[in-house]
Design a protein with these regions (language model features):
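Two-metal-ion RNase H-like nuclease active-site motif
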Residues: 3-12
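Short, conserved beta-strand segments within well-ordered enzyme catalytic domains
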Residues: 7, 20, 59-60
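Short N-terminal binding/cap micro-motifs at the start of the first secondary-structure element
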Residues: 14-19
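Short acidic-glycine loop/turn motifs at beta-strand connectors
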Residues: 23-27
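Conserved DEDDh/DEDDy metal-dependent 3′-5′ exonuclease domain
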Residues: 30-115
Length: 115
């Protein structure tokens, strides 16, 4: 069986969190939003669990240093979080780049799926 390959990107704002995922070698694109206008938390969590359960491999521009830690935190919280909480984590990652840029990295053994 071929490993599922997925490209992922996140965007964070104080009141909006977005995650876009595209299954490579297919036309399947998934867009998830957590905001006052739309709450895809449950479906995003289910999608990320599907990636985990199917041993997917994810790719992204800054998955190691930014998107991955946000996804990891979201998964650790069981998908029960807010855009504000994810934004605060994103800001902590950005602000730590000069002092301790590895503080928010997720060890490979702690990742819900490969990235």
């Amino acid at each position: 069986m071929t490993q599922i390959a997925v490209t992922i990107d996140t965007e964070t704002y104080p009141d909006v969190f977005l995650l876009v995922a595209r299954i490579c070698d297919s036309d399947l694109t998934f867009i998830f939003e957590i905001s006052p206008y739309r709450n895809d938390s449950e479906s995003l969590y289910m999608f990320l669990c599907w990636l985990r359960d199917n041993h997917a491999r994810c790719y992204g521009f800054n998955l190691l240093g930014f998107d991955g830690p946000l996804i990891h935190m979201f998964m650790q919280m069981g998908g029960k979080t807010t855009a504000r909480t994810l934004y605060e984590k994103a800001q902590a990652i950005i602000e730590s780049q000069d002092e301790d840029k590895f503080a928010h990295m997720v060890r490979p053994t702690d990742r819900p799926f490969e990235w």
